[in-house]
């Protein structure tokens, strides 16, 4: 893993590169880890798509959705069951793996099984969590809080780099806009790149989430995922984060904003075309 200190930093995980001036790479997978079989099936399908399209892929999923709307909502398989599955995906499929951490005490253990530690948006200012993630030496992907201006993320990134870890990604996932609503300000993408000096990821699926919008769960408008993803790629980003599932409507979490797996390849093809035009204008 490496990160340059030039105006166009690059974070590398194996053969996957994230750079604001490079062709986009993709972070994709289901919202939460549902079972070993489900994870391997989705990861295998995504790997095949990435190979056909010749695009960098990081597999993502969560062992614990710690901020569910309802106390009774499914949260995932938990740390003990999930880490061996993460390790198997890395070893058997050769895919880099991303998962989120919620407590500083989780970071060292989780880092043994994954390539990227993700800091959830609601926790992006938690200094102890950021420092613990940075101390692992792994790539740290920090989601911008829905309550922050893009330039506020400069302080967040500095907390990580102050621990001698330059391997940072920052992810835009929308800003709070009234009750149960997020809005994506595309100006945030170049501002994040300029003020943080990090590769910028656009989270196309959580940006269409309606937090708490269904009473005991969050709603979403997945029909707008392609629209926002195309807009972000046209502006210019290092990568796109897309949650996908074979049957989103039966998923235990974030179903309303996940992309059906059968639609994933077509979406990525279109995004690659927009990306090529944005970064190689004629």
Curated annotation (Swiss-Prot):
GO terms for biological process: keto-3-deoxy-D-manno-octulosonic acid biosynthetic process. Its EC number is 2.5.1.55. It is found in: Cytoplasm. The keyword Secreted does not apply. It catalyses: D-arabinose 5-phosphate + phosphoenolpyruvate + H2O = 3-deoxy-alpha-D-manno-2-octulosonate-8-phosphate + phosphate. InterPro entries: Aldolase_TIM, DAHP1/KDSA, KDO8P_synthase. One of its GO terms (cellular component) is cytosol. It comes from the Bacteria. It is an enzyme of class 2 (transferase). One of its GO terms (molecular function) is 3-deoxy-8-phosphooctulonate synthase activity. SUPFAM superfamilies: Aldolase (SSF51569). Keywords: Cytoplasm, Lipopolysaccharide biosynthesis, Transferase. The keyword Repeat does not apply. Pathway: Carbohydrate biosynthesis; 3-deoxy-D-manno-octulosonate biosynthesis; 3-deoxy-D-manno-octulosonate from D-ribulose 5-phosphate: step 2/3; Bacterial outer membrane biogenesis; lipopolysaccharide biosynthesis. Belongs to the KdsA family. This is 2-dehydro-3-deoxyphosphooctonate aldolase. It comes from Bradyrhizobium diazoefficiens (strain JCM 10833 / BCRC 13528 / IAM 13628 / NBRC 14792 / USDA 110). The gene is kdsA.
């Amino acid at each position: 893993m490496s990160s340059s200190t030039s105006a166009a930093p690059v974070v590398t995980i194996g053969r996957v590169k994230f750079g604001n001036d490079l062709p986009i790479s993709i972070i994709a997978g289901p919202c939460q880890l549902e079972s070993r079989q489900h994870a391997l099936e989705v990861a295998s399908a995504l790997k095949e798509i990435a190979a056909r399209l010749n695009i960098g892929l990081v597999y993502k999923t969560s062992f614990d959705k710690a901020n569910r709307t309802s106390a009774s909502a499914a949260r995932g398989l938990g740390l003990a069951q999930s880490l061996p599955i993460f390790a198997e995906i890395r070893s058997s499929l050769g895919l880099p793996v991303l998962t989120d951490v919620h407590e500083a005490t989780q970071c060292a253990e989780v880092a043994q099984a994954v390539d990227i530690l993700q800091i959830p948006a609601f926790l992006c200012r938690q200094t102890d969590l950021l420092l613990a993630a940075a101390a692992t030496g792994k790539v740290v992907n920090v989601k911008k809080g829905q309550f922050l201006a893009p330039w506020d993320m400069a302080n967040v990134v500095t907390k990580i780099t102050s621990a001698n870890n330059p391997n940072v990604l920052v992810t835009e996932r929308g800003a709070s806009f009234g009750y149960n609503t997020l809005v994506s300000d595309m100006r945030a993408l170049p501002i994040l790149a300029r003020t943080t000096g990090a590769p910028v990821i656009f989270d196309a699926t959580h940006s269409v989430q309606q937090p708490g919008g269904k009473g005991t769960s969050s709603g979403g408008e997945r029909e707008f995922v392609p629209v926002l993803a195309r807009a972000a790629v046209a502006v210019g980003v290092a990568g796109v984060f897309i949650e996908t599932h074979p049957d989103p409507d039966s998923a235990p979490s974030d179903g309303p904003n996940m992309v059906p797996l059968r639609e994933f390849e077509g979406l990525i093809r279109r995004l690659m075309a927009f990306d090529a035009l944005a970064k190689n204008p004629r």
